[in-house]
Structure formats: structure tokens, C-alpha cells
UniProtKB/Swiss-Prot annotation:
The keyword Isomerase does not apply. The gene is rpmB. One of its GO terms (cellular component) is ribosome. Disulfide bonds: none annotated. The lineage of its organism: Bacteria, Bacillati, Bacillota, Clostridia, Eubacteriales. The keyword GTP-binding does not apply. Gene3D superfamilies: Ribosomal protein L28/L24. GO terms for biological process: translation. One of its GO terms (molecular function) is structural constituent of ribosome. It comes from Clostridium perfringens (strain ATCC 13124 / DSM 756 / JCM 1290 / NCIMB 6125 / NCTC 8237 / Type A). Signal peptide: none annotated. Keywords: Ribonucleoprotein, Ribosomal protein. This is Large ribosomal subunit protein bL28. InterPro entries: Bacterial_rp_bL28, Ribosomal_bL28, Ribosomal_bL28/bL31-like_sf, Ribosomal_bL28_bact-type, Ribosomal_bL28_sf. Pfam families: Ribosomal_L28.
Length: 63
């Protein structure tokens, strides 16, 4: 599955996670990407979309 939203271009972000003793370990934060059938330029197409775009109505789902 793709790790980037095709609508808002949101992708994986890298950073550092701190434990209770303040030791660091590298990790990534991935967006919640869903595979959705949506209307793109008048035709239904399968796209990878983050849930933020789905909830905000930036994507019209094909039913």
C-alpha cells in the first residue's frame, strides 16, 4: 500500500521517540491511508487517500 495521500500529499514523517529514561530511538509516523474508489475527473478510480481528506470531503466516493 502507498504511504502517501494522493490528494494532500501527506506522507511518512521521521522523528525520535523518547523512553521514560530519556533514551532515544528513531521511528516513523505514517498517515492513516485508505484505498478508496473515488470519482476522479468524472470516472471512478481507486486512489490512496488519508482519512483526513475523506472526512473533510475533499474526495467524492464512488458507490
Amino acid at each position: 500500500m502507498a504511504r502517501r495521500c494522493e490528494i494532500c500529499n501527506k506522507g511518512v514523517v521521521a522523528g525520535v521517540q523518547y523512553s521514560h529514561s530519556h533514551r532515544q530511538s528513531k521511528r516513523t509516523w505514517a498517515p492513516n491511508i485508505k484505498k478508496v474508489k473515488a470519482i476522479v475527473k468524472g470516472t471512478p478510480k481507486t486512489v490512496h487517500v488519508c482519512t483526513r481528506c475523506l472526512r473533510s470531503g475533499k474526495v467524492q466516493r464512488a458507490i
